[in-house]
Amino acid sequence: MPAYRSRTTTHGRNMAGARGLWRATGMKDSDFGKPIIAVVNSFTQFVPGHVHLKDLGQMVAREIEAAGGVAKEFNTIAVDDGIAMGHDGMLYSLPSRDLIADSVEYMVNAHCADAMVCISNCDKITPGMLMAAMRINIPVVFVSGGPMEAGKVILKGKEHALDLVDAMVAAADESFTDEEVTAIERSACPTCGSCSGMFTANSMNCLTEALGLSLPGNGSTLATHADRQRLFLEAGRLVVDLCKRYYEQDDESVLPRSIATFEAFENAMSLDIAMGGSTNTVLHLLAAAHEAGVNFTMSDIDHLSRKVPCLSKVAPAKSDVHMEDVHRAGGIYAILGELDRAGLLHTHLPTVHSRTLGDALNQWDVKRTNSPTVQEFFRAAPGGVPTQVAFSQDRRWKELDLDRETGVIRSAEHAFSKDGGLAVLFGNIAREGCIVKTAGVDDSILKFTGPAKVYESQDAAVTAILTGQVTSGDVVVIRYEGPKGGPGMQEMLYPTSYLKSKGLGAACALLTDGRFSGGTSGLSIGHVSPEAAEGGEIGLVENGDVIEIDIPNRTIHLAVADDVLAQRRAEQEAKGWKPVKERPRKVSTALRAYAAMTTSAARGAVRDLSQLKID
């Protein structure tokens, strides 16, 4: 049986100094022999998705200690992508994922912790912790802070559900008065929690359920609801049990790499496609699989996207549907249940909480269980009161949404579309692929051909959109914004939001080697690989070039002759694959270090040290 890792620092005469330091943290003689479990928190007052986490780490710690473990809490950083959006702060968002993964590894390995509870929530925090969990491979349970309640605002006598993206769009839409924009701003983000649509944060927290690393309800139970407290308490108890099973019973099935296998990543990606999750999840699942030693690639995602239907549309794809509505329809296990009934799920896999995913579905899928407890759990409703306090209300819907024909979650027979909510496109402008969130694309533009309008920064594209230089039928190309070229692979929420505010959301396409916020909708194609800074063909596009997009056939094509592209490539090679004009962008040493080691979006923008020239 494997020895508890913590005994490296708690046992033996030569560890007297280490034990002395442990004693200074509050440990007693009786604690030296218990598993030491890291409570990996991410509390910060900068981020609404994390502002309520301050005391929750200690809540989990108390449960760990009551169950026979020793809990030690630390925090990671957390970047709010919405606040960092639209300026150079966004350069730091994706790099923060790797910094979080490293910091968790550093703390857990330096102090020889035996297991972890990862308290995450927002965009890069869950992926960063997930990468660390795969890398370290000790027992872990994920529990997130939970989704924000959707905002409510009355405009022109009618109530509207809304979220952060609505505030961005309204601010740039001249048809809204200043008073209406202010009302939307004040109502868009009413509570603590991750932004209320199927954006990146909520998508990732849902995917931890499909991977088998979090408890049912983790992705959809509101941050404000009292039911969410149960998830935190149970996580504390569960991680001690997992610890004992591994270290005392030699049960390797509880380890993250035993749970998050290739088939588990297929399950997670199938869920993502079915629920129209954020395109960023592709980037993060590829990175997590890399850390787990799982060969999960863009080709695998392409294969799944061709057979998994779109079973749910949530904001931004459907502006009046939010995570609270998904929860009412049975949450993530309801979507997994529909995938299972369609023969699209691997149900024999273990989870942290059940022997198999199939067992968990029998208990938690609202269409196959009669459990009053489960049904009450999924009737958890928003409180409708602005607050930054977790678990502060216990309202219930009168009934569940079990309509699988026209409801929030559909059966495969009544899917929103037979094609899933995400697609991978390949072509001469994206040899290694690119990603589009098809759930947010109007059916009328699934096939689109138009002239390119080329911009070499997000800022330049935003200026062009707001000043009327982009017109109906254009393909907006934003390049040199990839992992290396940005550096940091900025999100493009403002360009897509401004296209919508100008009435061009279903009249233009946007193509970039950067990425998109989970709040993005429209014909927005990101992660173009290879990126311009690495010699990708997106760097060869010129104004007026015709670009042909065919989502049903999964192709994207730059209609320029091969000999012309070869000539352009020679010219770019001579220039060193850089933007034509110097950008007013300060790139720090930290960001330059990130750029030196990162890889393309097609690989999850993971680090590859072989790129460094080390003597």
From Swiss-Prot:
For this UniProt record, the keywords arranged alphabetically read as follows: 2Fe-2S, Amino-acid biosynthesis, Branched-chain amino acid biosynthesis, Iron, Iron-sulfur, Lyase, Magnesium, Metal-binding
* Biological process according to GO: isoleucine biosynthetic process; L-valine biosynthetic process
PTM-bearing positions, type N6-carboxylysine: 124
Enzyme's top EC category? lyase
Q: Where does [2Fe-2S] cluster bind?
A: 122, 195
Q: Provide any one GO MF term from the record.
A: 2 iron, 2 sulfur cluster binding
Query: Which PROSITE patterns does the entry link to?
Result: ILVD_EDD_1, ILVD_EDD_2
Q: What cofactor does its activity depend on?
A: [2Fe-2S] cluster; Mg(2+)
Entry note: cofactor: Binds 1 [2Fe-2S] cluster per subunit. This cluster acts as a Lewis acid cofactor.
Q: Looking at the record's lineage, which domain of life comes first?
A: Bacteria
Q: Where does Mg(2+) bind?
A: 81, 123-124, 491
Protein's job = Functions in the biosynthesis of branched-chain amino acids. Catalyzes the dehydration of (2R,3R)-2,3-dihydroxy-3-methylpentanoate (2,3-dihydroxy-3-methylvalerate) into 2-oxo-3-methylpentanoate (2-oxo-3-methylvalerate) and of (2R)-2,3-dihydroxy-3-methylbutanoate (2,3-dihydroxyisovalerate) into 2-oxo-3-methylbutanoate (2-oxoisovalerate), the penultimate precursor to L-isoleucine and L-valine, respectively.
**UniProt family annotation:** Belongs to the IlvD/Edd family.
* Record's subunit section: Homodimer.
The protein's name is: Dihydroxy-acid dehydratase
Organism, scientific name:
Novosphingobium aromaticivorans (strain ATCC 700278 / DSM 12444 / CCUG 56034 / CIP 105152 / NBRC 16084 / F199)
